[in-house]
Amino acid sequence: GLTMEYDNYNEAEIRRDRKRKAQLKRKKRQRALRIKLIIMTVAAIVIAVVIINASSGLRKTSKQKAAFASDIIAETYAENETQTQQPTEPPLIYSQMAADYKDLSSDTQIASPYAALLDVNNHKIIAGKLADSKIYPASMTKVMTLIVVSENVDKMPQTYTFGFEMLNTLYREEASVAGFLEGETVDVEDLMYGLVLPSGADAAEALAIMAAGSNEEFAKLMNEKCKELGLKYTHFTNPTGLYDEEQYTTPSEMAMIMEYAMKDETRAKVLGTYQYKTKATAQHPEGIQLTSTMYSRIYGNEAPGVLVKGGKTGFTNEAGSCLVSYAVTNK
């Protein structure tokens, strides 16, 4: 983790860091190229995507950034038919409220004031609680960060060397980090796992700089992707999920973002991993052992009949505790 040594003002390192950032900005491509989606035949199964966003009365301390309620159980059913999607279809079909939508507002088992359950088989929100209300996504943001990175990875540098300035800022902001150190050079794969499993803001900002030159330019790519996916009530200003009044979504649209994220094999693998060890570096000769903030909490408390295939937790004081997850019935 980060230690107090980052409080020491290191003039030369800051100058080097700024010079490196300037070079990265100069190299930044003129414009983000959208990746064409290859839509293939998929087995049609009912997917449950649940968003939890704890109310202000349930907020935890800043030390519990990724804590979340684990008492929502999604009951659904599986279908064995297959469907063929034509390549002309949009990358994401905007979900509608199901005719038999179940309002969970009076469900005392669900502590969260916000929830959405999306059946990706028919693009319907089948249950929820203020499912179209504005919420702050906190680190659920990193699902969109992962999407944008994965679709720009061929145009990015393949490694990043961490500098003093960024790590020091994140330390002061008390952001959750993967634990990469000043001078450490890390590849894209390790950064992706560092982004998702421990919810590393260090990895998020590194990937943003690699893909776009800065957090601000990366946020533009995030918003372009939202527009491409047809999202109406989602906007991003940073890749980490740190609170910003202009960074928001809804439970329904966050579920749709997760649906899209899981369409890609690489993203699905990262979002569905419990533990991962980064490659050896001079700073970490044995690598860093990363553990999923989601899987570590649901381990031993799994909902019967449901297999969680991936997910991402979040926490800020303003957002409360939150979770987006993707599950299939395993009957």
Where are the model-predicted features located?
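Sec-dependent signal peptide cleavage junction
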Residues: I51-A69
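Active-site-adjacent loops and short helices of periplasmic peptidoglycan-processing enzymes
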Residues: D71-Y77, Q85-S252, A261-E265, T329
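A sequence/structural signal for flexible, mid-protein segments enriched
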Residues: R34-L37, E89-P91
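Hydrophobic membrane-insertion alpha-helices, especially the h-region
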Residues: I38-I52
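N-terminal Lys/Arg-rich, disordered targeting/topogenic segments
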Residues: G1-I35
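Domain-terminus/edge residues, biased toward the C-terminal soluble/receptor-binding domains
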Residues: L231-K232, Y243-Y248, S252-K331
